[in-house]
C-alpha cells in the first residue's frame, strides 16, 4: 500500500491538480509535511492509548499517506525503505549490548 500511496503522491507532484491537498502540502514544503507526519503519529498514539481500533486504523492511514508525501518530497523511494527493512530482517536486537540507563 505504501507503494501505491507513493506513486499517487509522485504523480500529484508531477501533475498538480488545483484544490488538491497533496499539492497543498508540496506547495507548503517539507516543514509543513513533517509537521503533519508528527501530528498524525501523535494521533495514532492517542488512539492506541484509548484502545480505539477505528481511530488507530484511521490515524495510521493518515500517517502512511503523509509519510508517502514526505518520501516523494525527500527523494526516498519505498524501495529504499524496503531495502533497509530487508537488511534488518533476521538480525538480533543489540539491546543486550547497551549500557543500562541509570540516570534519568
Curated annotation (Swiss-Prot):
GO cellular component terms given for this protein: cytoplasm
Pfam families reported for this sequence: PRA-PH (PF01503)
Any one GO biological process: L-histidine biosynthetic process
Chief localisation class: cytoplasm
SUPFAM superfamilies according to UniProt: all-alpha NTP pyrophosphatases (SSF101386)
Alphabetical keyword list: Amino-acid biosynthesis, ATP-binding, Cytoplasm, Histidine biosynthesis, Hydrolase, Nucleotide-binding
E.C. code: 3.6.1.31
Compartments, as annotated in UniProt: Cytoplasm
Entries under InterPro entries matching the protein: HisE, PRib-ATP_PPHydrolase-like
Entry superkingdom: Bacteria
Metabolic or biological pathway: Amino-acid biosynthesis; L-histidine biosynthesis; L-histidine from 5-phospho-alpha-D-ribose 1-diphosphate: step 2/9
GO molecular-function term, one example from the UniProt record: ATP binding
Catalytic activity, reaction form: 1-(5-phospho-beta-D-ribosyl)-ATP + H2O = 1-(5-phospho-beta-D-ribosyl)-5'-AMP + diphosphate + H(+)
Keyword flag Electron transport: no
Family per similarity comment: Belongs to the PRA-PH family.
Name of the protein in its database record: Phosphoribosyl-ATP pyrophosphatase
Gene: hisE
